[in-house]
Amino acid sequence: MAIKFSKFVINSNGNDVIDITEKVKAAILKYGVYDALINIHAPFSSSSIGVFEYTPDTVEEFLNFSKKFIKTKNHHHIKSLIVGNSATVPFIGGEFELDRFQRILLLDFDDKKR
Protein backbone atom coordinates (compact mmCIF):
# COMPACT_ATOMS: atom_id res chain seq x y z
CA MET A 1 0.00 0.00 0.00
CA ALA A 2 1.47 3.34 -1.05
CA ILE A 3 0.88 6.50 0.91
CA LYS A 4 0.89 9.86 -0.87
CA PHE A 5 0.83 13.27 0.78
CA SER A 6 -0.13 16.63 -0.61
CA LYS A 7 -0.49 19.98 1.11
CA PHE A 8 -2.10 23.21 -0.06
CA VAL A 9 -3.11 26.53 1.48
CA ILE A 10 -6.61 27.98 1.46
CA ASN A 11 -7.17 31.67 2.19
CA SER A 12 -10.25 32.51 4.24
CA ASN A 13 -12.13 35.64 5.21
CA GLY A 14 -12.88 34.13 8.61
CA ASN A 15 -16.18 32.55 9.67
CA ASP A 16 -16.28 30.99 6.21
CA VAL A 17 -17.29 27.77 4.45
CA ILE A 18 -15.13 26.96 1.42
CA ASP A 19 -15.68 24.17 -1.09
CA ILE A 20 -12.32 22.42 -1.53
CA THR A 21 -13.58 19.35 -3.43
CA GLU A 22 -11.95 20.16 -6.77
CA LYS A 23 -8.69 21.29 -5.15
CA VAL A 24 -8.44 17.98 -3.28
CA LYS A 25 -9.32 16.03 -6.44
CA ALA A 26 -6.58 17.82 -8.42
CA ALA A 27 -4.04 17.01 -5.69
CA ILE A 28 -4.96 13.31 -5.93
CA LEU A 29 -4.96 13.10 -9.71
CA LYS A 30 -1.49 14.65 -10.00
CA TYR A 31 -0.17 11.38 -8.51
CA GLY A 32 -2.08 9.30 -11.06
CA VAL A 33 -4.26 7.82 -8.33
CA TYR A 34 -7.80 6.82 -9.32
CA ASP A 35 -8.87 4.48 -6.52
CA ALA A 36 -8.13 5.22 -2.87
CA LEU A 37 -9.40 6.23 0.53
CA ILE A 38 -8.58 9.92 0.89
CA ASN A 39 -8.05 11.57 4.27
CA ILE A 40 -8.40 15.35 4.36
CA HIS A 41 -7.16 17.16 7.47
CA ALA A 42 -7.29 20.78 8.68
CA PRO A 43 -4.37 21.36 11.09
CA PHE A 44 -5.81 24.41 12.87
CA SER A 45 -7.76 24.42 16.14
CA SER A 46 -10.46 26.74 14.77
CA SER A 47 -11.15 25.02 11.44
CA SER A 48 -12.79 21.79 10.37
CA ILE A 49 -13.27 19.53 7.40
CA GLY A 50 -16.85 18.56 6.67
CA VAL A 51 -18.56 16.48 4.02
CA PHE A 52 -22.15 17.58 3.63
CA GLU A 53 -24.68 19.17 1.33
CA TYR A 54 -23.27 22.42 -0.02
CA THR A 55 -26.13 24.76 -0.86
CA PRO A 56 -26.60 28.37 0.25
CA ASP A 57 -29.47 27.31 2.53
CA THR A 58 -27.49 24.55 4.23
CA VAL A 59 -24.45 26.75 4.82
CA GLU A 60 -26.56 29.62 6.18
CA GLU A 61 -28.56 27.29 8.46
CA PHE A 62 -25.40 25.70 9.81
CA LEU A 63 -23.69 29.04 10.52
CA ASN A 64 -26.85 30.44 12.16
CA PHE A 65 -27.30 27.28 14.24
CA SER A 66 -23.72 27.34 15.47
CA LYS A 67 -23.92 31.05 16.37
CA LYS A 68 -27.18 30.55 18.25
CA PHE A 69 -26.13 27.56 20.35
CA ILE A 70 -22.40 28.08 20.84
CA LYS A 71 -21.91 31.42 22.54
CA THR A 72 -18.66 31.03 24.41
CA LYS A 73 -15.46 33.04 24.38
CA ASN A 74 -13.76 30.16 22.57
CA HIS A 75 -16.67 29.42 20.22
CA HIS A 76 -14.39 28.85 17.23
CA HIS A 77 -12.54 26.02 19.02
CA ILE A 78 -15.78 24.42 20.25
CA LYS A 79 -17.31 24.45 16.74
CA SER A 80 -14.17 22.87 15.32
CA LEU A 81 -14.26 20.19 18.00
CA ILE A 82 -17.89 19.34 17.19
CA VAL A 83 -17.44 19.11 13.41
CA GLY A 84 -13.98 17.51 13.52
CA ASN A 85 -10.76 18.37 11.74
CA SER A 86 -10.62 15.52 9.24
CA ALA A 87 -12.71 13.38 6.92
CA THR A 88 -12.09 10.22 4.93
CA VAL A 89 -13.76 9.94 1.53
CA PRO A 90 -13.64 7.05 -0.97
CA PHE A 91 -12.17 8.02 -4.36
CA ILE A 92 -13.17 5.51 -7.04
CA GLY A 93 -12.50 5.74 -10.75
CA GLY A 94 -11.13 9.27 -10.38
CA GLU A 95 -14.24 10.58 -8.60
CA PHE A 96 -15.28 11.02 -4.98
CA GLU A 97 -18.09 8.78 -3.76
CA LEU A 98 -20.36 11.62 -2.69
CA ASP A 99 -24.08 12.26 -2.93
CA ARG A 100 -25.30 14.67 -5.60
CA PHE A 101 -24.96 17.87 -3.55
CA GLN A 102 -22.27 16.75 -1.12
CA ARG A 103 -18.91 18.51 -1.21
CA ILE A 104 -15.71 18.47 0.82
CA LEU A 105 -15.73 21.69 2.81
CA LEU A 106 -13.24 23.67 4.84
CA LEU A 107 -15.07 25.39 7.68
CA ASP A 108 -13.14 28.28 9.20
CA PHE A 109 -14.75 29.31 12.48
CA ASP A 110 -12.25 32.03 13.38
CA ASP A 111 -13.42 35.63 13.18
CA LYS A 112 -10.19 36.80 11.55
CA LYS A 113 -9.11 36.75 7.93
CA ARG A 114 -6.18 34.43 7.15
Listing of model-derived features with the role each one plays in the protein:
Residues 1-114:
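Active-site histidine-anchored catalytic micro-motif
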